[in-house]
Amino acid sequence: MARFRFYGQLNDFLPWQFRHCRFMHALRGPASVKDAIEALGVPHPEVDVIVVNGQPADFTYRVQDGDEVAVYPPFHRVDITGLRRVGTDPPQPVRFVLDIHLRKLCALLRLAGFDALLLTDDAEVAELSATELRVALTRDVGLLKRRIIRHGYWIRQTNPELQFVEVLQRFDLADRMDPFVRCMECNTLLVPVDVDVVAERLPPGTRECFSQFHRCPGCDRVYWQGSHYERLVRLLEDARRKVRLKPDPTDAPCRKQALSGPAYIRPASSVGSAFRRTFRRARSRSRTNRW
C-alpha cells in the first residue's frame, strides 16, 4: 500500500472520495509511479511534478509499500526553478492537434490565429503530437494515456466557447491571439488577394461594400469582413476578458459545486503553499467564406 495525494486540476480525474485528500492505494505488484498514477485515472501529460517521500521523482520510480506520493499539475505562478519536472513545456509558439470531437474548438483556435489540426483517427492524433511536438487536445482520457504523447490536455468543458476560454487560460494565450489570419476550414495561412481575381466568386454587392479580401492557398476559399465579422470580434474579446477575470485553476485545488446548470470550478485552497512546503527539504538538499 502507498499513500497518494493529487493537487489542483488532477483531482478532476479521480473518484470523488479521493479528491483533495490523502488516500491509500493498493499496489498490484511492482509498478512505476507513472503506471500507478494512470491506473488511478490521471493521464501522464497532465502531470508536471512528482514527489515521493519528500524527494522529486520521475516517471520510472518504482513505488514501494509505505511510500508517500504527491502529484502536481503544471503551475503558472509557483516558481519551481531548479526542481525536477516530469513534464515539459511545449515549444513556442504552441501548436495543437485535436481529435474530431473538438471540431468547433478547432475552428475557434484557427479563428484566433493558432495552428490547430483536426484528425479523425486517435492513433494519428498521438503520432502527430509526438512527431511535431503539438499539444494534443481531447475529451478522451484514454487518448492522453498513450505512451508517445508528451504534450496533452484533457478538455474539461463541453461548450465550445468555454473550451476556447479554457485553452487560452491553460496555455497563457489570451494576449497572443492574431485573429483572421488562418483558414477556419483547413488551417492554412491566408494571403491577400485582389478583388478582380475573385470578383466572379463574390455574392452580388460584396465588391461594392468591401475592399479587402483574402484567399486560402490550401482550399481556395475567399474571406472578407462580412456580416459575422463584428460578432466574431466580440467573441474573441469576450474570451480574453473571461480569461482575465477567471481564477487560474492551475494555482489552486478545484472542487466542483453544483449549480442550476453545468458545474463550475472554483479555488478551494492554496496549493502553492502546499507545493512549497513539500519541496522545502528537497530544495535544501539538491539545489468561400466570410468572417
Mark where each language-model region is.
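Short functional micro-motifs and their immediate structural scaffolds
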Residues: 188-195, 224
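Intrinsic disorder/low-complexity segments
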Residues: 242-291
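Short, charged N-terminal beta->alpha structural module
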Residues: 89-119
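Short linker/helix segments within small regulatory modules
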Residues: 60, 200-213
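Ubiquitin-like/PB1-type beta-grasp interaction modules and other compact soluble beta-rich domains
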Residues: 1-95
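BRCT (BRCA1 C-terminal) domain core and associated BRCT-interaction motifs
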Residues: 120-145
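Short cysteine-rich clusters marking metal-coordination/redox-active sites
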Residues: 183-186, 216-219
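Short, flexible, mixed-charge glycine/proline-rich loop motifs
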Residues: 170-179, 205-210
